């Protein structure tokens, strides 16, 4: 009798993807974040489903329905905070996952990389719409400011904004459609994740050295399942510490005030994971220019495979490129800090310099460092 794991049409697919999958023998802990992202997605879908059972997407009752979840629903508070802080964990894992792809040259798997960029954009859109749902002050004004950016598009801008709003301002129609999209998008993300994995398993995983590892593969289970479980336990520890000790650490106090279109908060800012892009947007005094810079700050990832000039795939043996990479990480942290600061001196000039540096590092210094390293190889 053949093993059901290898003969059953459905179980066979799971077996080839997670059990008997040949994996490089030397992949480090930086490769844990793919599985952690999968866990985060499952957590977000499950907690989101339970929240949706009690949430009402109406401007008059949305805020009080979230309060009701926290006060009256059994363990509603923990579900709500797991969902809110789970999004933060999701983005931490996402940024590390993208950073690892950059560092070790995983972007040479073009299809996997491009699907990954689409996934990043979709997750960002989902998180933005989710932030609007509690209908607090920052929810309302965040939605107003960010959707209003589309009015910078020549000719069709204003019509487009009113079409998204479903009226002449952010109101009931906007909240209802954002809830609908926020509910459906995670399932679209799940489908994209499957495509992402499909393309990855066509080529096999990259590894820290960046050289082909076909001659030295080990089965995914038990080696990497155990390794991933360790990463998962650390993620759960971090998430539960955040949820149980300081659930509002990463939130905004303004969101505990019900939305009021007549009162603008002193500092409108998005969640922490969007602050780097928000800082780039604010650093350009022109509206359309700012919007373009905002979009390019993410889409520039699609250019990275084209800008790869090195003869080596990974940065493991390229100290100059490593310096540029860590400068980029420091620059992104600076942008994140600046995005949360008020628009005044000296933050404005720091933000502008950090934005110029961000694009310069990717477009100029990374290819330049690679070219210098190529020439050094000849010596």
Curated annotation (Swiss-Prot):
<protein>
    <recommendedName>
        <fullName>Cytochrome b</fullName>
    </recommendedName>
</protein>
<dbReference type="InterPro" id="IPR016174">
    <property type="entry name" value="Di-haem_cyt_TM"/>
</dbReference>
<dbReference type="InterPro" id="IPR030689">
    <property type="entry name" value="Cytochrome_b"/>
</dbReference>
<feature type="transmembrane region" description="Helical">
    <location>
        <begin position="288"/>
        <end position="308"/>
    </location>
</feature>
<feature type="transmembrane region" description="Helical">
    <location>
        <begin position="347"/>
        <end position="367"/>
    </location>
</feature>
<keyword id="KW-0999">Mitochondrion inner membrane</keyword>
<keyword id="KW-0679">Respiratory chain</keyword>
<feature type="transmembrane region" description="Helical">
    <location>
        <begin position="178"/>
        <end position="198"/>
    </location>
</feature>
<keyword id="KW-0830">Ubiquinone</keyword>
<feature type="transmembrane region" description="Helical">
    <location>
        <begin position="320"/>
        <end position="340"/>
    </location>
</feature>
<keyword id="KW-0479">Metal-binding</keyword>
<keyword id="KW-0813">Transport</keyword>
<dbReference type="InterPro" id="IPR048259">
    <property type="entry name" value="Cytochrome_b_N_euk/bac"/>
</dbReference>
<feature type="transmembrane region" description="Helical">
    <location>
        <begin position="77"/>
        <end position="98"/>
    </location>
</feature>
<dbReference type="InterPro" id="IPR036150">
    <property type="entry name" value="Cyt_b/b6_C_sf"/>
</dbReference>
<dbReference type="InterPro" id="IPR048260">
    <property type="entry name" value="Cytochrome_b_C_euk/bac"/>
</dbReference>
<feature type="binding site" description="axial binding residue">
    <location>
        <position position="83"/>
    </location>
    <ligand>
        <name>heme b b562</name>
    </ligand>
</feature>
<dbReference type="Pfam" id="PF00032">
    <property type="entry name" value="Cytochrom_B_C"/>
</dbReference>
<dbReference type="GO" id="GO:0006122">
    <property type="term" value="P:mitochondrial electron transport, ubiquinol to cytochrome c"/>
</dbReference>
<keyword id="KW-0496">Mitochondrion</keyword>
<dbReference type="GO" id="GO:0005743">
    <property type="term" value="C:mitochondrial inner membrane"/>
</dbReference>
<dbReference type="InterPro" id="IPR027387">
    <property type="entry name" value="Cytb/b6-like_sf"/>
</dbReference>
<dbReference type="GO" id="GO:0046872">
    <property type="term" value="F:metal ion binding"/>
</dbReference>
<keyword id="KW-0472">Membrane</keyword>
<feature type="transmembrane region" description="Helical">
    <location>
        <begin position="33"/>
        <end position="53"/>
    </location>
</feature>
<comment type="subunit">
    <text>The cytochrome bc1 complex contains 11 subunits: 3 respiratory subunits (MT-CYB, CYC1 and UQCRFS1), 2 core proteins (UQCRC1 and UQCRC2) and 6 low-molecular weight proteins (UQCRH/QCR6, UQCRB/QCR7, UQCRQ/QCR8, UQCR10/QCR9, UQCR11/QCR10 and a cleavage product of UQCRFS1). This cytochrome bc1 complex then forms a dimer.</text>
</comment>
<feature type="transmembrane region" description="Helical">
    <location>
        <begin position="113"/>
        <end position="133"/>
    </location>
</feature>
<feature type="binding site" description="axial binding residue">
    <location>
        <position position="97"/>
    </location>
    <ligand>
        <name>heme b b566</name>
    </ligand>
</feature>
<keyword id="KW-0812">Transmembrane</keyword>
<keyword id="KW-0249">Electron transport</keyword>
<dbReference type="GO" id="GO:0045275">
    <property type="term" value="C:respiratory chain complex III"/>
</dbReference>
<feature type="transmembrane region" description="Helical">
    <location>
        <begin position="226"/>
        <end position="246"/>
    </location>
</feature>
<feature type="binding site" description="axial binding residue">
    <location>
        <position position="182"/>
    </location>
    <ligand>
        <name>heme b b562</name>
    </ligand>
</feature>
<keyword id="KW-1133">Transmembrane helix</keyword>
<comment type="function">
    <text>Component of the ubiquinol-cytochrome c reductase complex (complex III or cytochrome b-c1 complex) that is part of the mitochondrial respiratory chain. The b-c1 complex mediates electron transfer from ubiquinol to cytochrome c. Contributes to the generation of a proton gradient across the mitochondrial membrane that is then used for ATP synthesis.</text>
</comment>
<dbReference type="InterPro" id="IPR005797">
    <property type="entry name" value="Cyt_b/b6_N"/>
</dbReference>
<feature type="binding site">
    <location>
        <position position="201"/>
    </location>
    <ligand>
        <name>a ubiquinone</name>
    </ligand>
</feature>
<feature type="binding site" description="axial binding residue">
    <location>
        <position position="196"/>
    </location>
    <ligand>
        <name>heme b b566</name>
    </ligand>
</feature>
<dbReference type="GO" id="GO:0008121">
    <property type="term" value="F:ubiquinol-cytochrome-c reductase activity"/>
</dbReference>
<dbReference type="Pfam" id="PF00033">
    <property type="entry name" value="Cytochrome_B"/>
</dbReference>
<keyword id="KW-0408">Iron</keyword>
<comment type="similarity">
    <text>Belongs to the cytochrome b family.</text>
</comment>
